């Protein structure tokens, strides 16, 4: 039931100054393919003071994640159950080791210099090639580092392309077959309440399911 987020080490890395300055919401459309065919959902990011809240729609009220790099914690909020789960984020050194083991050197990153306007922001198309397949990421440095809420909660390593490029956020991702699994549709700079980045007092803590070992 838990929709996950990997790249935990990315959350602990020091963001760039201009990324820290962003406060507001980022709305995106994310898609995936499964046994039942293509699926799509709207995901909302809220960013304030280094903290992040990711909200995903779904039956029974969906779920939200709060990431607090200073606490090295991730909180999964389950609104329908008035409950939450807590996860400790790995340290950056351990994440770098996992990234290297995952084969970061096998990924080739090519900046094309081609730019596009997406959701009112300028991004540069970057080709990420691995094992004969290339993915086009249109990246901006204005929103900080990306966290993928659709990935599984396995204490995942930093994605190889992020290891090479640093704190950049994809506004649009295009696969080799032309499909677009991620596209930002709206970016709004605005003040956000601290309460959005805290677990509600009425929520009860429940146990996080054990992670499956990679592979």
Model region roles, listed by residue range:
Residues 1-3:
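N-terminal export leaders
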Residues 6-7, 17:
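Cleavable N-terminal signal peptides
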Residues 18-215:
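Extended soluble regions of mature proteins
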